[in-house]
Amino acid sequence: MTLELLKLTDEYVQYKFFPEDDKSNFGIVQVDVKEPAKRFVVQDAKNVSGMYKGMAMVRVSLLVKNGEFPQTSACAWC
């Protein structure tokens, strides 16, 4: 799955997530930059496992905790 930075403000960050790297089907997750545990799905990807949105929220929360806001990021199933 790939992530692409969509929006970064003083309050939150939003990333698009692309399950299976399919650019035609994406979701959007938002994470609070001060409290990374505050996170939710703005838009869900269609016809894919809900695990993708969970993985996207966890990955973006980890980036926020590390103070990292890359333009793109990737994560794989462990």
Residue ranges and their predicted role:
Residues 1-2, 50:
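A broad, low-specificity signal for short, low-complexity segments enriched in glycine/proline
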Residues 3-32:
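N-terminal acidic leader/helix
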Residues 28-78:
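Acidic, low-complexity intrinsically disordered segments
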